[in-house]
Amino acid sequence: MRGARSAPTTDPQELRRRLAAARPRGLEIDGFRRASVLVPLLYGPDGVEVLFTVRAAKLSSHAGEIAFPGGRLDPGETHVEAALRETEEEVGLVVSEDQVLGRLSDHPSPAGYVATPFVAQVPWPQELTLSPAEVDAVFTVPLDELAAIEPRTRVAELQKYRRLLYSYPWGEYLIWGFTGNVVRDLLEAITNGQAQGHDPFDPE
């Protein structure tokens, strides 16, 4: 039985502390390339929301799936630089490194990437400009409502590895796979300030 989860904090300084205390895990897999994503926490008059994208239906991988903005590193880029660049390119959201509150554990994707997620505080509302080549739509979920969802879990195979996948249903959307696992780590870190759970390849 899962322990009681406290309400997620929205204070930026406390978020920084909890993200650091959660001891994010690095991950290296032979043959996998590096990528990074941004988890935008939108601070607006109605509270804090999390921004998600719906990947373009014409993409060659993960088409139509729910994601965070992000992508592979360009030569010479740091992980955080790549996350911020990709976010601006995909949804037109300009975020500075000063707005980044911390990072979460690395996670692999079936496309052959290991991605590092970064969490950022973003003023809201803002006008977004979506890249039609990459993004069909965006939507937001209030952070407290996201934290209240009881996730579904299943064990899946990634090449020769077994891993536990978390899924969060939200209206017409299902936040799952890589993105669902990042959401799980985010909620574990900012509600209880706990280390980010199982190794992705050790679901027992």
Where are these regions (language model features)?
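N-terminal leader/linker segments that precede catalytic domains of diphosphate-processing enzymes
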Residues: 1-126, 135, 156-158, 162-204
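Amphipathic alpha-helical blocks and their helix-capping loop/short-beta junctions
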Residues: 130-162
